């Protein structure tokens, strides 16, 4: 787990990570269209606005809010995250959709999906064994 966190820290510090930014930062035109169409991080001031075809999800212990395209909910990796959520919080949870996953891991997953890359094996293992 420590090795994964170290790797995620390097990804977070790299230039590639800049493709996925919070709403408070100015994204490039290329990443801006992706952020609008699949996942964005919203500031607390913008919590009420969810674009049509998107779903708000809260990630990690920090309850970081992301707005995710509903199309991503059918992706096998996202289904794995939803299954982890069901195991952690139960199916009858009321209120917001929570993903029990570290924010950096979630961002890495979304970045892989955005780039059309397979989700890295170490992340798939984390989803599968419930240690995210």
Curated annotation (Swiss-Prot):
Q: Name one GO cellular component term.
A: cytoplasm
UniProt subcellular location: Cytoplasm
Q: In which tissues is it expressed?
A: Highly expressed in the steles of roots and hypocotyls.
Matches recorded under InterPro entries: SAUR_fam
Identify one Pfam family in the record: Auxin_inducible
State any GO BP term from the record.
auxin-activated signaling pathway
Q: Provide the assembly information.
A: Interacts with and inhibits PP2C-D subfamily of type 2C phosphatases such as PP2C67/PP2C-D1.
Supply the name of the protein.
Answer: Auxin-responsive protein SAUR72
